[in-house]
């Protein structure tokens, strides 16, 4: 269902300032599994858009606002329902992911998470850093937001 969207993400090359986690087909598939689960299990959607993937969360999992630690330790059905299908080569804890999903633990409705720029912006040559996306990167990100909504 999300194949075309995932393929568009995969088309974007990494650079000295941006890492594309969706070049890894396993990470791209994890995003697809997450989106399909949300679509299948909810009938109304709220899209919550963050800034960009962090190096310890979405850069590794492919799922916005989500770290491997969140996936492994959450009792939310979204994760208990999919975690055995996901590829996690590294388990990291990420502060924002922990705060967001802990808050949602007792909520009946979950948002669909996305980022204004879906790739990991980092300092030059340092993929273990986070930086805010540039205006041009946010403009680029609008394309992917529109594709996701379609």
Feature-to-residue mapping (PLM):
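A polyanion-binding, active-site-adjacent surface
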Residues: 1-150
